[in-house]
């Protein structure tokens, strides 16, 4: 593999060097994602553990009152604090892994940009802006082409965006309406996040296929980035943006509403109604209160 500071002799050697540098990137990403998945599963287990202990603690307080200290209260409190600290440590571990993946991409991208700049300085590669300016005179307006892609006139929106499994039917109310609005917003992100690669021959784009790729590269990247920046809503226990498979809680008053599969230990869409751990705990408390009132 070439040295990091070595200047490429020509464009082909720069391409070969970049290909060699990123050869192991996929396997490195797989390893990082596997580590994050393990941390996610452990975190979910710890969270369920301290929620169960917290429920037991509340039950003891209700039975004996807050002034009378139960012998089990100390050990339960210690367990809750221990599991909560463990959850915090796991979240920190996941942040470090995510930053590692970001660093790997940034490092390779910076090196590719530096090689391109050095080739331009040596006169071995024509500056991209100059090449596009020369070809613009004999082609259609790029702005109109990009607008056509953005409006869906040159290609249809891809359906490979974020997948949001439909929640099973539940009682009508504010919770259901709120989840439906989130589903519609998710679908709009899917349509805006990716555009089709199939461009109609009659779309009025320049004849040179190389020019086509260069002309739309930066604008499409900015457009796609814009679609992702719109969805800054935080979901789930982990309070992160939406990604991958997500499931909606059927609890009408759920404060999170959407959950990542890995955070709730799911691998496939649940059958029937599904409630998050906190809503399940709330439902259990409601049933317990009803029984006490009947007694």
From Swiss-Prot:
Where do the segments described as Disordered lie? 151-208
User: Per its UniProt record, what Pfam families does this chain match?
Assistant: ING, PHD
Q: Which GO annotations describe the biological process of this protein?
A: chromatin organization; DNA repair; meiotic cell cycle; regulation of DNA-templated transcription
For molecular function, the Gene Ontology terms on record are:
methylated histone binding; zinc ion binding
Keyword Zinc-finger attached: yes
Recite the UniProt keywords alphabetically.
Cell cycle, Chromatin regulator, DNA damage, DNA repair, Meiosis, Metal-binding, Nucleus, Zinc, Zinc-finger
- The annotated regions of Low complexity compositional bias extend over 156-171
**Annotated family:** Belongs to the ING family.
Site annotation (Histone H3K4me3 binding) points to 235, 246, 250, 258
Q: GO cellular-component terms in the record? A: NuA4 histone acetyltransferase complex; nucleus
Q: Where does Zn(2+) 1 bind?
A: 236, 238, 260, 263
**Binding-site residues for Zn(2+) 2, renumbered to this chain:** 249, 254, 276, 279
Basic residues composition-biased segments: 175-190
Zinc finger regions typed PHD-type: which residues?
233-282
Protein name as annotated:
Chromatin modification-related protein YNG2
Query: Could you tell me where this protein is found in the cell?
Result: Nucleus
Lineage, highest ranks first: Eukaryota, Fungi, Dikarya, Ascomycota, Saccharomycotina
Function text = Component of the NuA4 histone acetyltransferase complex which is involved in transcriptional activation of selected genes principally by acetylation of nucleosomal histone H4 and H2A. The NuA4 complex is also involved in DNA repair. Involved in cell cycle progression and meiosis.
The UniProt subunit note reads as follows:
Interacts with H3K4me3 and to a lesser extent with H3K4me2. Component of the NuA4 histone acetyltransferase complex.
Q: What is known of its domains?
A: The PHD-type zinc finger mediates the binding to H3K4me3.
**Organism the protein comes from:** Kluyveromyces lactis (strain ATCC 8585 / CBS 2359 / DSM 70799 / NBRC 1267 / NRRL Y-1140 / WM37) (Yeast)
């Amino acid at each position: 593999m070439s040295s990091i500071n070595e200047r490429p002799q020509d464009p082909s050697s720069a391409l070969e060097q970049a290909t060699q540098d990123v050869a192991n990137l996929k396997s490195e990403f797989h390893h990082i994602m596997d580590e994050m998945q393990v941390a996610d599963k452990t975190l979910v287990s710890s969270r369920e553990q301290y929620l169960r202990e917290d429920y037991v603690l509340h039950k003891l307080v209700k039975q004996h009152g807050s002034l009378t200290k139960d012998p089990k209260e100390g050990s339960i409190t210690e367990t809750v604090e221990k599991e909560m600290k463990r959850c915090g440590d796991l979240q920190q571990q996941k942040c470090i892994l995510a930053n590692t993946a970001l660093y790997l991409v940034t490092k390779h991208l910076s090196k590719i940009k530096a090689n391109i700049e050095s080739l331009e300085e040596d006169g071995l590669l024509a500056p991209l802006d100059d090449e596009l300016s020369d070809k613009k005179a004999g082609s259609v307006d790029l702005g109109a082409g990009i607008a056509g892609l953005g409006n869906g006139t040159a290609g249809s929106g891809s359906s490979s965006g974020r997948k949001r499994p439909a929640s099973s039917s539940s009682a009508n109310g504010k919770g259901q309406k709120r989840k439906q609005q989130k589903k519609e917003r998710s679908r709009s992100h899917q349509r805006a996040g990716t555009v089709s690669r199939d461009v109609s021959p009659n779309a009025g784009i320049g004849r040179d296929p190389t020019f086509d790729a260069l002309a739309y590269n930066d604008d499409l990247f900015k457009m796609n980035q814009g679609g992702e920046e719109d969805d800054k809503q935080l979901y789930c226990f982990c309070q992160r943006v939406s990604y991958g498979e997500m499931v909606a809680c059927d609890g009408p008053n759920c404060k999170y509403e959407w959950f990542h599969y890995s955070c709730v230990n799911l691998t496939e869409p649940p059958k029937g109604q599904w409630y998050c751990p906190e809503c399940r705990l709330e439902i259990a408390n409601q049933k317990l209160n009803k029984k006490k009132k009947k007694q």
